[in-house]
Amino acid sequence: MSEIKKALNTLEIEDFDAIEMVDVDAMPENEALEIMGASCTTCVCTCSCCTT
């Protein structure tokens, strides 16, 4: 089994940071971009904030 599969198999829900569970579609665009640490002018992105 690959190392990544081993890591995924041992992953616990507590291992996720709260920031990873934020619903970016439910917040203002500028706040979502701030959390993601990117802007639509500097990355190729398919997120709803970049495609609307």
Swiss-Prot record:
Its main location: secreted. Keywords: Antibiotic, Antimicrobial, Bacteriocin, Hydroxylation, Methylation, Secreted, Thioether bond. There is a cross-link at residues 39-48 (Pyridine-2,5-dicarboxylic acid (Ser-Ser) (with C-47)). One of its GO terms (cellular component) is extracellular region. Transmembrane segments: none annotated. Maturation of thiazole and oxazole containing antibiotics involves the enzymatic condensation of a Cys, Ser or Thr with the alpha-carbonyl of the preceding amino acid to form a thioether or ether bond, then dehydration to form a double bond with the alpha-amino nitrogen. Thiazoline or oxazoline ring are dehydrogenated to form thiazole or oxazole rings. Maturation of pyridinyl containing antibiotics involves the cross-linking of a Ser and a Cys-Ser pair usually separated by 7 or 8 residues along the peptide chain. The Ser residues are dehydrated to didehydroalanines, then bonded between their beta carbons. The alpha carbonyl of the Cys condenses with alpha carbon of the first Ser to form a pyridinyl ring. The ring may be multiply dehydrogenated to form a pyridine ring with loss of the amino nitrogen of the first Ser. The modification (Z)-2,3-didehydrobutyrine is found at residues 42, 51. The modification 3-hydroxyvaline (Val) is found at residue 44. There is a cross-link at residues 44-45 (Thiazole-4-carboxylic acid (Val-Cys)). It is found in: Secreted. The modification 1-amino-2-propanone is found at residue 52. Has bacteriocidal activity against Gram-positive bacteria, but not against Gram-negative bacteria. Inhibits bacterial protein biosynthesis by acting on the elongation factor Tu (EF-Tu). Belongs to the thiocillin family. This is Thiocillin. It comes from Bacillus cereus (strain ATCC 14579 / DSM 31 / CCUG 7414 / JCM 2152 / NBRC 15305 / NCIMB 9373 / NCTC 2599 / NRRL B-3711).
